[in-house]
Amino acid sequence: MNQQTASVATKTRDYHVDNIKGILIILVVCGHLLSYLQDMNSTFAIGVRTFIYFFHMPGFIFMSGYLAKGFLKKEYKGEKLLSYAWLYLLFKNGIDLVHFIFRRPYFAGNSHTIELILIVCLFCFGIWLLSQLYSRFPAFQNGFILLVVLYSVLKTNVLTVGAAPWYMMALIWYHIIVYLTKNMKQSHVLAAAVIIAAFANYQDPIGKFLTLSRMINFLPFFLLGFYMTRERFETIVNHPKWKYLLSILFILSAFVITINGRAIKKWIGVFFFGVSPYSKLLKLGDWYYHIAPLTCILWMAVTIMILFGLFALCPRGKTFLAKLGRNTIGIYVLHRFFKDFLIYGGFYGVLSQNEYIAVIETIVVSLLLAIAFGTDFWAKTMNKLSVVNVKWLYKKV
């Protein structure tokens, strides 16, 4: 019976989508690891990272929306939202813990290779042990949740969402929005989201408060994925003419954006991430300021074409990327901790002095991290930790 079930699951699984998610999560890891090289003013690293940041999160969010269609049919919607909130708290506090450890005076100055390896091993073992206790003992689960929530409220600014955990908070907003607008015409909701995203930056950004700025800027991509049917998606990426044109566009975009990465980089925050207001454009002239919403909409359109170029290039069959694509949450969360381990361990100091080779070395390490954390072991570990059981709230008295 189990073999038959597994066989059916294998046949019905969309490996093309898994491969797309696999490539996107590798790009997420690459983008984060290249950020430190960018801070070291490597021109090539800036170009490559700018190209990745041009489309990787819009693509990741598009696929999140595309795969979220079953949310409205779920009986326990609150459980889904709370699992994202819980992962957000774990993620945020986990990053704070890593910084707390390595910012101790003991780690200042000299190299501590042995200590670093020991801490990394203990950190990995601790996550596994925590997942076992959390999943097997309800009393421990409830106590741990209470402890983390209390600590988050008392010791950290839980409403200020920065760095990688913002994605978890954004998913909560997106699922709430699709639920609240489920009876509205899809084209109207999508158009409203585009208009709001295009005009929002005339005001000073809300900043990191509940990740509202980024949520607004990326909302059109989630809705586009959520509303797009599988038939329409496959028609676009598999149509011979469109597939060829979009693939060429993706390759040309990679070349143009990478070459002009330093010039493009400073405007991504204005048009995409919602971290800079349109008033920043005034130094270029009033005309640029007044047409900013149109520029933002054009930016979205170009990004969508680049995305579908990537989708068209992705393999359709079962590859190692498909496994990574199935286990994206574990990779997304765990690689962020190891980025800090690499920084504190002096990884960037041993890279080649040649900026091109240094970027290649960083990409290779990014791929290795994605493969390591994309294993079934870590997928099961993270799945156990992400569960928040609230079904008792739905029980009839």
Which role fits each region the language model picked out?
Residues M1-I196, G317, K323, N327-G330, ...:
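Membrane-cytosol interface segments of multi-pass membrane proteins
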Residues L24, C30, L90-G94, A192-A197, ...:
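Alpha-helical transmembrane segments of multi-pass integral membrane proteins
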Residues L33-Q38, H99, A197-T211, A254-F271:
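C-terminal ends of transmembrane alpha-helices
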Residues V48-H56, T160, A164-M168, K208-L219, ...:
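Hydrophobic alpha-helical transmembrane segments of multi-pass membrane proteins
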Residues C124-L130, W173-Y179, F222-E234, I304-K318:
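Alpha-helical transmembrane segments in multipass membrane proteins, preferentially the mid-helix core
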Residues A193-E234:
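Loop-centered beta-sheet repeat module
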Residues I236-A322, N327:
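Alpha-helical transmembrane segments and terminal signal-anchor/GPI-anchor hydrophobic tails
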Residues V256-R262, R336-Y348:
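Hydrophobic alpha-helical transmembrane segments in multi-pass integral membrane proteins
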